[in-house]
Regions:
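A compositional/structural signature for long, glycine/proline-rich flexible linkers
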Residues: 27-310
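C-terminal motif of bacterial Sec signal peptides marking the signal peptidase cleavage site
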Residues: 20-24
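Core hydrophobic alpha-helical transmembrane segments of single-pass membrane proteins
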Residues: 14-19
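Bacterial N-terminal signal peptides that target proteins for export
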Residues: 2-12
């Protein structure tokens, strides 16, 4: 590392360590050298401080959609006291009203299409979404949004028509064949996915008609759709509480969890390898929590730089 960069990084690390209220630079020790000695002693094969900071910066930008998505899922599905809770996984919740400014989990919801929402757990088996026949004059849609925040498919009047139909939603690890009766298969890149239904409200007196359409929306595991025995349930997950303040310091702990359910695509292999090198995600050789204080301070600095880019 160039001497001037070393001095600058040392000063930044000391500032970051002091900011989180921990000792580290009061004896004028070189935090970069201290980290190298600590990692060697602990046999942790972590990159150098400067590289760790760069990985954290890139990883923050890459991982932010996953963490924001987890925050919405936590409020809608996992925390019954969130004030935004809708329903457990693989259950549909119908809103018999339009969204207002008080509905804060999603930044910009529509105000003229009452929502029906379902968060899908696709780990054990695919899920079938069934829609009724809808008057062609009435707009409706089902937007499929995965943990990467990719919109990977639409069902509805403009995309698939207004006729009744059954649609298969599959996770990234599913290898089965399309069963009879399925109109189309949609592939999520993550194990968990949001299905957001929108049904047009024509005027204030139209809500009973909207509710009748909503009553026709169904979600079933594939085994139930086929009248077959269900496969073994997916393992329970120890979901961490989502807290916007904690995210500021524990962002990569949340990302480490989220990456378990988001297999890397070919275009993600490079950043995933970098994250694994600092103890985050599949393929890691040590736990993120085992990093030295100096490396964690470098990660905080990298996060701040990444935040400036988004």
């Amino acid at each position: 590392m160039h001497p001037s960069r070393h001095i600058t990084l040392t000063a930044l690390l000391c500032g970051a360590i002091a900011a989180i209220g921990l000792p580290g630079c009061e004896k004028k020790a070189d935090p970069v050298a201290v980290a190298q000695v600590a990692d060697k002693k602990a046999e942790i094969p972590v990159p150098g401080i400067a590289e760790v900071k760069a990985i954290a910066e890139e990883g923050f930008v890459y991982g932010l959609p996953l963490i924001m998505n987890y925050g919405v899922m936590y409020e809608y599905v996992l925390d019954k006291n969130s004030g935004q809770f809708k329903a457990p996984f693989n259950n549909i919740y119908n809103e018999h009203r339009v969204f207002t400014y008080e509905d804060t989990a999603i930044p910009t919801p529509n105000s003229d299409t009452p929502y029906s929402l379902a968060w899908l757990d696709l780990r054990a088996e695919p899920v079938v979404i069934s829609v009724p026949a809808v008057d062609p004059k009435r707009y409706y849609s089902v937007m499929l949004n995965d943990g990467n925040t990719f919109n990977y498919g639409y069902i509805g009047s403009r995309a698939t028509g207004s006729e009744a139909g059954d649609y298969l939603i599959v996770g990234p690890r599913w290898k089965g064949e399309t069963p009879p009766g399925i109109k189309k298969v949609f592939n999520s890149t993550t194990d968990f996915s949001l299905a957001a239904f929108r049904t047009q409200l024509i005027d204030a007196k139209d809500m009973p008609n909207v509710e009748a359409v909503q009553a026709g929306y169904k979600i079933r595991p594939l085994s139930a759709f086929l009248n077959q025995p269900a496969p073994p349930a997916a393992p329970e997950v120890a979901w961490p509480k989502f807290d916007k303040e904690l995210v500021k310091t524990e962002f990569f702990d949340y990302l480490d969890l989220a990456l378990q359910f988001a297999p890397a695509g070919p275009e993600e292999e490079a950043i995933r390898a970098k994250l694994a090198s600092i103890g985050i995600g599949p393929g890691k050789k040590f736990a993120f929590k085992d990093l030295s204080l100096e490396h964690k301070a470098a990660i905080l600095l990298g996060m701040k730089e990444g935040d400036k880019k988004v």
